[in-house]
């Protein structure tokens, strides 16, 4: 039987188009802000790293919250991370970035306009037939208001994929502050301003990526309903998802 998603969570036509087009090299994704004559083109898809998720439970959230800095310093409890209600196959999965370019001029200086359009966790290579918003374990679809989009938030304009079972250890480097100032963290620097933290004791990882103000977590479903990919857009101007 073919999978049929919940209409309350389904991507609209513009969002579905954006999610598909962002990962199609050579496709036009829009035009440069304030210059409708210059297209924004998808230049390529880059695999920036892999991530280990041994528990099959996935957090997609900001790795830290600016509002909780004082609690981090005092060692006080903070809110739990936004763990997705859907589980994924335990194992190693690819993290990929969709790159775009839209050249522009600013005060006489020329820029290539290279941007990250979206970041995805690739679960399988099976074709996606539909997109739905991913709920967190504490979300209730029955309580969603018309037009409301479940999402995570980030004052620092970042998000992350992480194994939920190792969250405390994996997020710790991002939550080290002194006098309100972040302590330099020892993370693995990756392309596209991404970072990775490893927990070898649990064979689990966290990968941080750019996400303007956070974002909706989109699940790409196959004809059988399996999750093939999980996408967060970067929130660049003109983003439709």
What role is predicted for each listed range?
Residues 1-241:
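N-terminal domain-onset segments
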């Amino acid at each position: 039987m073919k999978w049929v998603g919940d209409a309350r969570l389904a991507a609209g036509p513009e969002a579905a188009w954006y999610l598909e087009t962002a990962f199609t090299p050579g496709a036009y994704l829009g035009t440069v802000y304030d210059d409708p004559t210059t297209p924004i083109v998808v230049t390529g898809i880059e695999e920036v790293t892999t991530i280990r998720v041994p528990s099959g439970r996935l957090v997609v959230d900001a790795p830290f919250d600016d509002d909780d800095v004082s609690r981090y310093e005092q060692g006080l409890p903070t809110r739990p991370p936004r763990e997705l209600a859907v589980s994924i196959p335990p194992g190693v999965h690819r993290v990929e970035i969709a790159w775009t370019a839209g050249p522009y001029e600013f005060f006489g200086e020329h820029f290539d306009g290279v941007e990250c359009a979206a970041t995805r966790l690739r679960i399988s290579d099976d074709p996606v037939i539909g997109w739905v918003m991913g709920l967190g374990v504490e979300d209730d679809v029955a309580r969603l208001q018309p037009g409301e989009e479940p999402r995570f938030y980030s004052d620092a304009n970042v998000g992350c994929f992480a194994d939920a079972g190792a969250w405390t250890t994996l997020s710790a480097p991002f939550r080290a502050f002194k006098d309100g100032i972040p302590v330099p963290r020892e993370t693995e620097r990756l392309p596209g301003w991404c970072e990775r933290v490893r927990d070898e004791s649990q064979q689990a990882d966290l990968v941080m990526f750019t996400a303007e103000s956070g974002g909706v977590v989109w699940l790409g479903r196959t004809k059988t309903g399996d999750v093939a990919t999980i996408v967060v857009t970067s929130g660049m101007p003109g983003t439709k998802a």
